[in-house]
């Protein structure tokens, strides 16, 4: 029996862990223990721990990491510190054989650091990708702590190897969030439940930590651009709690646009595939929209450098540029997107490797390969 520790902080990581957890549940020789923290436990971000419960996923531990809810880089640093402080005792109690961490999210960064210090093998999902914000540094730092790497494409694999990781410990498995998307049941009632008319845009714009002071002006430009498309409805999903989020939330709430604090995976998928495009700077616009051939209007630097499909139309934070990108996206509708992040079989591959790979003390001590 291999025991696996997993932590989730927000929808962005939970949506990718969910299909893996479902796959783990099919195996009698595997057992997971889930730690829930961060946005999941915050009312202002939708208290999405309830979505996890609705999915009938077993929750073993919870703790709050955003104690002060401080909208700054200092607040993010404090939250990371809290998670690093809380996790050793949880892991001592869990006694996992391995940790499955992912992406570039703070709670996952924390468990990766703690696991490495406690000599617990760390399996990291989606290392090797290039992004904007502090996420760029976090992701690559996690890769250096991790022992095995489940990359989303060959481009990311090669970058991990160039970072000095052992090539035999790097695997191209695709993006597991696509597995989750394809498993969602179609729900034709979703538009009525959110009072939406077609055509409409989904909008998800997060703050950029390295551009902390500009989040207000950035969302203003996006709102101005969307207002030019009078025949299109819209639904804003409020941002994560990275530094600068309060300004975005205030401006969205002050506008006449519809908004929600958060969406569960099922509603998000059913809205996304019925939309005319995803506007903003979410990684979902890079990883997930190609699955349903939905165009993405990607604004700013947050996803800078990431491998993207032909459905992505980039723009700076400028009203006129955003308008042109939206027009291009509308013209693109009906086309087929390249599937550069896999086709929905990532979870089974990841679980196969979890069962088979060496987790003995032989792999704990890492050394750069050059």
Label the model's feature ranges.
Residues 1-370:
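Nucleotide-activated sugar donor-binding and catalytic core shared by glycosyltransferases
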